[in-house]
């Protein structure tokens, strides 16, 4: 929180720290939320968090409207960080993902070892859970491939759906826009029609997600990882 930052940095006042953290948030390096998953934020105050780079800051930096085009090396860094740190470790990840990265699971059963595509009706569970806090942004992986001149040429478009506090964060930092439940379902249906694979985030336990991706093999870093390292 700003109060905690001020305690550790007494040379700066709260207004300065708030402005500085907002700027860093807009860059995508840090994220903010109002959650109480750790039990330390019962009043749901705004808190900032330094994400892991992949999945995390890298994707957010890519969906920044101007930053990644202005600094194309961020696309190179994203691509390499979605590969190099994973070699030698990813091969040991069991089917189901073990709570790492992205995964495709049936929401109703939430069996970690399960590995199959998510039917569109299962995704409606998450959209109903977070209704009123749903957003959409361009696909970070497709944008990365476009900047790098690689991939299958899939149009980056608005394919990445954010939910909960992450959707609010994206709206407040100009990384995305709010959409309704019905609009989200339309995006998912279009993805189904194109043969894309639905993936949900898999790093916060079975009761929370922050995003739904509509992925294609020729552009998605997560699907590439599963193929290169044989981790379904």
Regions picked out by a protein language model, each given a short descriptive name:
Residues 38-86:
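Short, amphipathic alpha-helical interaction segments positioned at domain boundaries
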Residues 72-179, 201-204:
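Long, Pro/Ser/Thr-rich low-complexity/intrinsically disordered regulatory tracts in eukaryotic proteins
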Residues 25-39:
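A short, conserved structural fragment
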Residues 48, 201-207, 227-232:
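Ferredoxin-like iron-sulfur electron-transfer modules
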Residues 10-26:
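Short amphipathic alpha-helical interaction segments
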Residues 174-203, 214-216:
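Compact structured core domains
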Residues 137-145, 209-223:
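Local cysteine-cluster metal-coordination motifs and their immediate loop/turn environment
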Residues 1-9:
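Short acidic, hydrophobic short linear motifs in intrinsically disordered regions
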């Amino acid at each position: 929180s700003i109060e905690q930052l001020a305690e550790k940095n007494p040379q700066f006042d709260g207004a300065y720290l708030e402005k500085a953290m907002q700027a860093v948030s807009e860059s995508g390096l840090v994220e903010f939320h109002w959650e109480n998953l750790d039990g330390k934020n019962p009043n749901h105050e705004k808190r900032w968090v330094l994400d892991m780079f992949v999945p995390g800051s890298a994707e957010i930096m890519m969906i920044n409207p101007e930053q990644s085009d202005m600094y194309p090396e961020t696309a190179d860094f994203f691509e390499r960080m979605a590969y190099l740190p994973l070699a030698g470790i990813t091969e040991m990840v069991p089917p189901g993902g073990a709570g790492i990265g992205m995964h495709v699971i049936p929401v109703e059963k939430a069996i970690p070892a399960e590995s199959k595509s998510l039917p569109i009706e299962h995704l409606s569970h998450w959209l109903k859970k977070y209704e009123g806090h749903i957003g959409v942004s361009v696909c970070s992986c497709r944008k990365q491939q476009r900047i790098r001149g690689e991939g299958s040429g899939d149009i980056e478009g608005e394919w990445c759906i954010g939910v909960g506090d992450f959707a609010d964060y994206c709206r407040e930092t100009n990384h995305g826009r709010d959409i309704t439940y019905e609009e989200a379902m339309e995006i998912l249906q279009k993805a189904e029609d194109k043969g894309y694979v639905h993936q949900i985030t898999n790093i916060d336990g079975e009761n929370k997600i922050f995003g739904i991706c509509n992925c294609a093999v020729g552009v998605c870093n997560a699907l590439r990882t599963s193929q290169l390292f044989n981790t379904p």
